[in-house]
Amino acid sequence: MALQLENGRPHHHQVPIMVKKKRTGSGSTGESSGEAPGAPGHGSSQRAERGPQQHGGGRGWVPQHGGRGGGQYQGRGGHYQGRGGQGSHHPGGGPPEYQGRGGPGSHHPGGGPPDYQGRGGSGSHHPGGGPPEYQPRDYQGRGGPRPRGGMPQPYYGGPRGSGGRSVPSGSSRTVPELHQAPHVQYQAPMVSPTPSGAGSSSQPAAEVSSGQVQQQFQQLATRDQSSTSQAIQIAPPSSKSVRFPLRPGKGTYGDRCIVKANHFFAELPDKDLHQYDVSITPEVTSRGVNRAVMFELVTLYRYSHLGGRLPAYDGRKSLYTAGPLPFASRTFEITLQDEEDSLGGGQGTQRRERLFRVVIKFAARADLHHLAMFLAGRQADAPQEALQVLDIVLRELPTTRYSPVGRSFYSPNLGRRQQLGEGLESWRGFYQSIRPTQMGLSLNIDMSSTAFIEPLPVIDFVAQLLNRDISVRPLSDSDRVKIKKALRGVKVEVTHRGNMRRKYRISGLTSQATRELSFPVDDRGTVKTVVQYFLETYGFSIQHTTLPCLQVGNQQRPNYLPMEVCKIVEGQRYSKRLNEKQITALLKVTCQRPQERELDILRTVSHNAYHEDQYAQEFGIKIDERLASVEARVLPPPRLKYHDSGREKDVLPRVGQWNMMNKKMVNGGRVNNWACINFSRNVQDSAARGFCHELAIMCQISGMDFALEPVLPPLTARPEHVERALKARYQDAMNMLRPQGRELDLLIVILPDNNGSLYGDLKRICETDLGLVSQCCLTKHVFKMSKQYLANVALKINVKVGGRNTVLVDALTRRIPLVSDRPTIIFGADVTHPHPGEDSSPSIAAVVASQDWPEVTKYAGLVSAQAHRQELIQDLFKVWQDPHRGTVTGGMIKELLISFKRATGQKPQRIIFYRDGVSEGQFYQVLLYELDAIRKACASLEPNYQPPVTFVVVQKRHHTRLFANNHNDQRTVDRSGNILPGTVVDSKICHPTEFDFYLCSHAGIQGTSRPAHYHVLWDENKFTADELQTLTNNLCYTYARCTRSVSIVPPAYYAHLAAFRARFYMEPETSDSGSMASGAATSRGLPPGVRSARVAGNVAVRPLPALKENVKRVMFYC
């Protein structure tokens, strides 16, 4: 992992623990969305009958095969009576609100409110009936008329355990089902100028005619939408026509304050910028060589041929000047001494010379007028070319002084080097980027650190890498693999030729030891050994003859260099994955308190001396050396609801934190049947039993219905037998439970502290093979057994078995703007990419969606593998041909919408989509592709079903930092010295015209807090700044795994966790089970004749093993 740390934290989140998902069945649905009055949240005790599961397609909201009857959902103290069982008279099938309206033949004996009627053409009825979760319900229980929005007002009070314990057989509300979209060969729609009209609709869904779908997509923009008064805008045909929403005014809610930001005002120059094309022959790939050529050219010809201009060069094909050069095109010849040959130029060592031909040709004028217009808010598009020129100008001088990496610069002189272990060291540096903001041009400067390879003799590097004396015993095969992997591509210089320090790039290791290597030295076929050649030619006696040689050059002309004559060249960034110890060491180096970081940033700006930078002077760029002072507001925390049976029924968090003391989970899940497996040889059976008992008690105290004893005694097993142990224990438990109609609800697993691949293997087997949620606990926690740890684990277990820990009081009292007024679904989506160096691993996309309304607390998730480093989520919407059903539609959005409908009894009338992991350069592409997929998924469920969409990108990998205006004012900082949670900024350092804001929603723990940046790319719900900022901040207090507000909105966080988890599902080619066929290639529900691997970019992506149905319905990723 090429880990760059800017705020003392790595960019990924480690997933600590796991838990078995609660199955639906006798005694435990564990799911409690839409509680009955008086029901504190323990789900029904029996499973309702369901029709066969529908995988993938289906006709609209209604599954392909109808279910049986209208089940009941029995909570504690009330019940929901399903309507439309055997006697229900809906000839069209499904609830009346989903019937097509207006065409001949669409008669609705069941009635239904007109605003829920679909508007299909003739005969748009849905045969086949539907399971009870599709039927409208009579909500019986305590209290009054049905609340607005068509959803029962959940009741979170009442004595725990009052009534409802003995439930009639078969009376259960089904847990919402999720079907993983089958993996099929699907040609994703191209992101090209095709409107979301006839041209962009892929194949029509089977449930309506081809003509209807064509018409429906053509008219998306113009038709009124039945569930909202706002017209739906057509999906933009291309980036040329896209306009991101303008800022709807600035927010006013919250306590006003001033913060400082690491942005420095840059005065816009009034120079006349010119761009020239550069062609250098022979062509070289190294920017460093190109720059050396240009530096030499400017040194020689600046005053004689360039009119005294000092150009800025991007290292490739473009040169920029402040004013014109005295020619339109000119050719120069430049001679460079080859730095690969010699550095010292000592006696008798003549360096080779290389001749380069450079052609400089006028290309265009870079107009700064448009940039000024954009900054003033009078032009919509940012003139990227002008911004790029200014960026290149300000990077010119640091590039000559430091080692550039992306937009950052590093040097061993910018701070003390720190050893990271195994031949690596950290270098300090800074990030620099020019940005357009409301205050004008801004230079964003931040501190950064990254890993470099220590400039050691190769022998010493290898000894550090293997952590042993390599002269004692020969290298093993695994040692050789490790060395080869670490050194491939690394540049070394030879040390056995005095001042002649020629440089080479390592391509591999020899398979033989140095003493066994020989090669021809002349045309007559004379052969010499490497040892003999070095002794005779250089007088150098090789000592480590048992080690392999480094191989440099290519396979046709291999060149052998003994390790002991090579030294690693300084300044090479390590771009591969760091191990845990190295990450910890790098974190330690980079973790800075806010005050220290602020001082370092100011020192860096002062040290860079932009006022003396000859390139900045040439182009007329002036940089203010003071941090920007920015108006901010601190949003208040939301009040959180807990169960009425606890001593504290709600809580108002203080500085982003609260605790579970005297509180009970608002909906405690039920775990009647659980087991424990111990993979740690340090934990005795008695210790495992004691730990599990304490954990069970904590779960009970926290509000869960948790059996104190496991169904079987804890089993101790060896990590290498993980699959055998899991399956055997699961089978033993089910042999006991199945005859009684019960299921295993949870598996508690004790792991060694360093468990390698065990955690991932265990999760894969549990979640994709056994259908079991699991909770992993490390050995060190078993021995410590702290109350705080047990309480945190209980929070995770509860949501894994379908419970809720807390909900927003405002959600229950229907006071969340644009969420509480009508059924709203909130999505989170993320794509995680493989680590650098893993060239063929797929990227993993994850989408989660809220499954409860009005609470918006529970999120079901789906995951999918896609092409390597593909950022667009490919499986949001899919169309394929089925030999029996014709054109079938599916995909992650459709599955989650159906699941929401099943869980709440209502279709979403609003969509809020938080998308993580998108860089600014991908905004247009991601919006065009993914908004189109959302639209198509909705239209495939029901003709003209187009709920308004708000699409928000969440960014954490930016370099804006906010600091308190006065670090000594305790009222404006938290305990770590960071700004207060809830601090929001939407002025000065934000976009000149678009709808974006920075929100620091969490309290700092260590280091400097990084605010999340939210940028709205599409908004049909017409949020005000206050509404979206408050919603986002409040949601950050609903994260299930801790009693703290978190730094990014939970749906995006959950999507990240789900994607991270799914990487464990990719088995190696062989495992202890011998093959991968168990779930990947035989993806369940795949239509006959459809291949399981989707082809993306000519590379078949192996699909992930399918999640089991009962796992995907709960928050298994927590």
Swiss-Prot record:
SUPFAM superfamilies recorded: PAZ domain, Ribonuclease H-like
CDD domains on file: PAZ_argonaute_like (cd02846), Piwi_ago-like (cd04657)
GO biological process, one term: regulatory ncRNA-mediated gene silencing
Protein's UniProt keywords contain Methyltransferase: no
Residue stretches of biased makeup (Basic residues): 10-24
Protein name as catalogued: Protein argonaute 1B
Matching PROSITE patterns: PAZ, PIWI
Pfam name, any one: PAZ
Biased composition (Low complexity): 25-35, 148-157, 193-219
Record keywords, A-Z: RNA-mediated gene silencing
Signal sequence annotation: none
Gene3D superfamilies reported in the protein's UniProt record: 3.40.50.2300, paz domain, Ribonuclease H-like superfamily/Ribonuclease H
Sequence segments annotated as region (Disordered): 1-175, 188-246
Species annotation: Oryza sativa subsp. japonica (Rice)
InterPro entries, per database record: ArgoL1, ArgoL2, Argonaut_Gly-rich, Argonaute_Mid_dom, Argonaute_N, PAZ_dom, PAZ_dom_sf, Piwi
Record keyword Magnesium present: no
